[in-house]
Amino acid sequence: MTATALTATDLCCRRGDRWLFSGLSLNLARGEALHVLGPNGLGKSSLMRMLAGLLPPSPDPVSGITGAIAWDGPLALMDERHGLDLGQPLGAALAFWARVDGPVPDEAINGLGLANLLDVPVRYLSTGQKKRAALARLIGQNAPNWLLDEPLNGLDVAACAMVERMIARHCAGGGACIIASHQPLGIPALTRLDLAEYAL
């Protein structure tokens, strides 16, 4: 029997006077990748922040019951905030986080095309290069559960393929991953969750 990475039940999200989604439940097993999709404004980023524990679920608009989220093991979140010191060379910026989270494996540095950028100040990196560096930092956290919010934004076709390979490798090794993206994903055995089905 495959171990469960995440169980979430009856998640609802209200921002101000607007309900984004309601009644969302999901289970994620080890080795699985889930693609959360839907147009902008439906609450993809809000769901990711909720799953990361940064945003509390809203009480159900009918029952008043607040949903629950249970992870098996640590999780790591990657969103638009890369957290890298703009004034430092990339290698030094990653080394800072390595002292906090753990070192980034050379395999990840090479697989994400960062080996030739380690001496370049972060401020001079392109959006796509910073995105790949943020993924390298996430890999260094050695968490079994990944939350990736729009990881392909700003990436060219080759870089998208790099990121997809890293996600596939993580899941093949027993990790679990939830990816919020409006772009198609080329990841084996990917399941999908359309937030439009839970919109109010």
Language-model segments: what does each one mean?
Residues A52:
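Helix-to-loop junction immediately C-terminal to a conserved catalytic motif
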Residues L6-A8, L20-G23, L155:
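Conserved structural motif at the start of ABC-family nucleotide-binding domains
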Residues R81, L86-V104:
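Q-loop/switch helix immediately C-terminal to the Walker
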Residues L135, G174:
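Hydrophobic anchor residue at the start of the ABC signature
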Residues P103-L117, A136:
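Conserved ABC ATPase "signature" region
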